[in-house]
Amino acid sequence: DMMRLVHAIGIETVLSDLAVYIEQDFLRWELFDKTPRIASHSPNGVIELMPTSDGEVYGFKYVNGHPKNTSEGLQTVTAFGLLADVSNGYPVLLSEMTILTALRTAAMSALAAKYLAPAGAKTMALIGNGAQCEFQALAFRTICGIQNLRFYDIDRGATEKAMRNLGQTGLHLTACDSPED
């Protein structure tokens, strides 16, 4: 499963490798069908289907976002995906992708920052300290060399949890009282 793979390889290696694959795919941008995601919105959240193909492989990801799920003991986000061979239409992979979604999001963010952030930046702010922020922190350290993190969330408990979970990573962590800090 994905978590065993991440633990065996190491999260920094997974994030770094993902960023390389993402960058390689950007270099093949013109080959991809760029179909907008299909979204179904409800008062409780959103379900999205994200299809694409490079002409050889067709793939899609199904992902939801239901913020109040945690009050019922459910995950806020769940995802799965499928890859199929375009030449014969046969599925070649069906995979749970919840953790991969978090990793890919973080790797993509850090890859963008690699090109867009000021050269030599070592400090960043994480505004909103839910589960994704921990993946972001590790990706930005691995891909961009970030060493100092400033945390802010309207839920102080989220900041405390993120800082606790990242406390042994060697990053310099600072809790902030406002987004301006």
Language-model regions: role of each:
Residues 143-169:
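NAD(P)-binding Rossmann-fold cofactor-contacting core
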Residues 125, 149-150, 174:
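A structural signal for isolated positions on well-ordered beta-strands in alpha/beta enzyme cores
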